[in-house]
Amino acid sequence: MTSTLNTLKSNSGSRKKKLRKGRGIAAGQGASCGFGMRGQKSRSGRPTRPGFEGGQMPLYRRVPKLKHFEIINQKNFSIINLEKLNDFKDNDTVNLDSLVKKGLIFKPKFPLKILGNGKLNVKLKVQAHAFTKVAKQKIEDAGGSCELINNK
């Protein structure tokens, strides 16, 4: 027997019949339809909104709203992209001091991190506290070197 569209049937157990509530007690979901006796949750419409505690002051309003939580052990960096390093000449050493002298970083408050945005056209010796993977790859591809400095 060949299967055609009019003879196709779904697998047994793959489809479940919808419960028809309120159609007599023999159906199993008649009378109160599985909602119990009386009360707000047996009425029509959504019973209560999420987080409702029956009129009691809810938890999200009892807990104080504290502001200005600082991240513990947050690492801040003075960042610079590779495209800015093209201002240097070949075989120059790039570090936080040389970037301040060139005017590329104004206030060296934090350790230096090199980001990989842009293209590097010069061969440089870069000394920084952190590099992104892309930045390190691009510096080495340009013939330069990356030196990690420990910030203590």
Swiss-Prot record:
Which keywords are on file for this protein? Ribonucleoprotein, Ribosomal protein, RNA-binding, rRNA-binding
Q: Does the keyword Ribonucleoprotein apply?
A: yes
A biological-process GO annotation:
translation
Report the InterPro entries cross-referenced here.
Ribosomal_uL15, Ribosomal_uL15/eL18, Ribosomal_uL15/eL18_sf, Ribosomal_uL15_bac-type, Ribosomal_uL15_CS
For the keyword Thylakoid, the answer is no
- Tell me the disulfide pairings in this chain: none
Biased composition regions of type Gly residues, renumbered to the chain: 25-37
Q: Which SUPFAM superfamilies match?
A: Ribosomal proteins L15p and L18e (SSF52080)
**Segments of skewed composition (Basic residues):** 14-23
Q: Which domain of life is it from?
A: Bacteria
According to the record, the residues making up region (Disordered) are: 1-57
GO MF, any single term: structural constituent of ribosome
Example GO CC term: the record gives: cytosolic large ribosomal subunit
Which PANTHER family does the record match to this protein? 50S RIBOSOMAL PROTEIN L15 (PTHR12934), LARGE RIBOSOMAL SUBUNIT PROTEIN UL15M (PTHR12934:SF11)
Tell me, in a sentence or two, what this protein's role is: Binds to the 23S rRNA.
What family does the Swiss-Prot or TrEMBL record give for this protein?
A: Belongs to the universal ribosomal protein uL15 family.
Q: How does it assemble?
A: Part of the 50S ribosomal subunit.
Q: What is this protein called?
A: Large ribosomal subunit protein uL15
Name its species: Prochlorococcus marinus (strain MIT 9301)
Q: What is the lineage of its organism?
A: Bacteria, Bacillati, Cyanobacteriota, Cyanophyceae, Synechococcales
Q: Which gene encodes it?
A: rplO
